[in-house]
UniProtKB/Swiss-Prot annotation:
Additional notes on this entry: Lacks hemorrhagic, anticoagulant and coagulant activities.
Activity regulation (record text): Myotoxic activity is inhibited by suramin and rosmarinic acid. Cytotoxic and myotoxic activities are inhibited by pre-incubation with varespladib. Suramin inhibits this myotoxin by (i) direct blockage of the MDoS and MDiS, preventing the toxin/membrane interaction and disruption and (ii) formation of an oligomeric complex, resulting in a tetrameric configuration for which both MDoS and MDiS becomes physically inaccessible, thus avoiding any possibility of toxin-membrane interaction or disruption.
Organism per entry: Bothrops moojeni (Lance-headed viper)
InterPro entries per record: PLipase_A2, PLipase_A2_Asp_AS, PLipase_A2_dom, PLipase_A2_dom_sf, PLipase_A2_His_AS
Protein name: Basic phospholipase A2 homolog myotoxin II
Site feature (Cationic membrane-docking site (MDoS)) residues: 15, 19, 113, 118
Functional description taken from the UniProt entry: Snake venom phospholipase A2 (PLA2) homolog that lacks enzymatic activity. Shows high myotoxin activities. Also shows neurotoxicity, since it induces muscle paralysis when tested on mouse phrenic-diaphragm preparations. Displays edema-inducing activities. Also displays antimicrobial activity against E.coli and C.albicans, as well as antitumoral activity against some human and mice cell lines. In addition, it is effective as parasiticidal agent against Leishmania sp. and S.mansoni.
Subcellular location: Secreted
Family designation: Belongs to the phospholipase A2 family. Group II subfamily. K49 sub-subfamily.
Site (Hydrophobic membrane-disruption site (MDiS)): 112, 115
């Protein structure tokens, strides 16, 4: 669910997920879809593609369990869809951390999604 995703992003990046990534570039946050503006936005694009491959669960609502061991996210679900959902969220949280150095505040909040160019299909 969005709850676990937000928690993972906070743990990996130290940033408030809603404030920092809720409306960022063309792909981070609700809605938005388009050619990624930078590496951070690309993380979100890949994450949305990961969600599209899921069948049998709702990425925004379905809760799953994971643990935080030695600063590593460990997904722990028996249900295959929830496990894949957790892995999608884990991947984006790690990607966002790995790209903190290219995070650009100009793409946060004020970037107009109508100006996003159509992205390649997943």
């Amino acid at each position: 669910s969005l709850f676990e995703l937000g928690k993972m992003i906070l743990q990996e990046t130290g940033k408030n997920p809603a404030k920092s990534y809720g409306v960022y570039g063309c792909n981070c946050g609700v809605g938005g879809r388009g050619k990624p503006k930078d590496a951070t936005d690309r993380c979100c694009y890949v994450h949305k593609c990961c969600y599209k491959k899921l069948t049998g669960c709702d990425p925004k609502k379905d809760r799953y369990s994971y643990s935080w061991k030695d600063k590593t996210i460990v997904c722990g679900e028996n249900n295959s869809c929830l496990k894949e959902l957790c892995e999608c969220d884990k991947a984006v949280a790690i990607c966002l951390r790995e790209n903190l150095d290219t995070y650009n505040k100009k793409y946060r909040y004020n970037y107009l999604k109508p100006f996003c160019k159509k992205a390649d299909p997943c």
